[in-house]
């Protein structure tokens, strides 16, 4: 299962952890993905979107 927003295509971000001793290890910041139902002209569609996208969909009144 891909950790990707179905509407915006946004995926996880990569970066580094830094300890107090300044050691570096790679890490990922995953999206807060949720399954929501979106209104379309053909009915409703279930998509996996991030919490940020859900806020935008609510603002545009596109959630079912």
Curated annotation (Swiss-Prot):
CC per GO annotation: ribonucleoprotein complex; ribosome
GO molecular function: structural constituent of ribosome
GO BP of this protein: translation
InterPro entries per record: Bacterial_rp_bL28 (IPR050096), Ribosomal_bL28 (IPR026569), Ribosomal_bL28/bL31-like_sf (IPR034704), Ribosomal_bL28_bact-type (IPR001383), Ribosomal_bL28_sf (IPR037147)
Keyword entries, A-Z: Ribonucleoprotein, Ribosomal protein
Family in the record: Belongs to the bacterial ribosomal protein bL28 family.
Name the UniProt record assigns to this protein: Large ribosomal subunit protein bL28
Gene that this sequence comes from: rpmB
């Amino acid at each position: 299962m891909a950790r990707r927003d179905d509407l915006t295509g946004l995926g996880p971000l990569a970066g580094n952890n830094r300890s107090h001793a300044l050691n570096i290890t790679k890490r990922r910041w995953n999206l807060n993905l949720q399954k929501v139902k979106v209104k379309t002209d053909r009915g409703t569609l279930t998509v996996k979107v991030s919490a940020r996208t859900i806020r935008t969909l609510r603002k545009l009144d596109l959630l079912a």
